Amino acid sequence: QILTETELLPGILQQNRYLNFICKNVFVKIKNKENVYFNNIKKNILELHIAHNEGNYFCSHDQLKSLKDNNQIAVTYCNKEGLEIEETNPNGALENIAGIFNKNKNILGMMPHPERMIDKYLSSDDGSYFFKNILESFR
């Protein structure tokens, strides 16, 4: 949230569509792998966790066009098969957007919490791919 409020990332995070706190597992589709966050992750769909009251991403039409033109949409909410449908959008985020990059793709803001999904005992270790990938980029 601080990334949008300080304008390091475009748009805003609004209160969730149904005005409630959401805490659950979701699936996200990786939309851009040309960055240090996702470039070596083999999977295209990750199971991650969300826990927020204000996670409803919104931006202007011009900002959305710019995000698309510059390939800045990082991840979107989807189902297990990767379909980005309304039913998979937990908070009402514009076009199922779960995370975006800045233009240089060195700043990532996303609603899902990969740190909460780093062990199979937590139902998924998909979050570990995210952190392992970042570590690999520094080697």
Regions found by a protein language model. Give the residues of each.
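Cysteine-nucleophile active-site neighborhood
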Residues: 1-35
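C-terminal and late-domain segments of enzyme folds
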Residues: 38-139
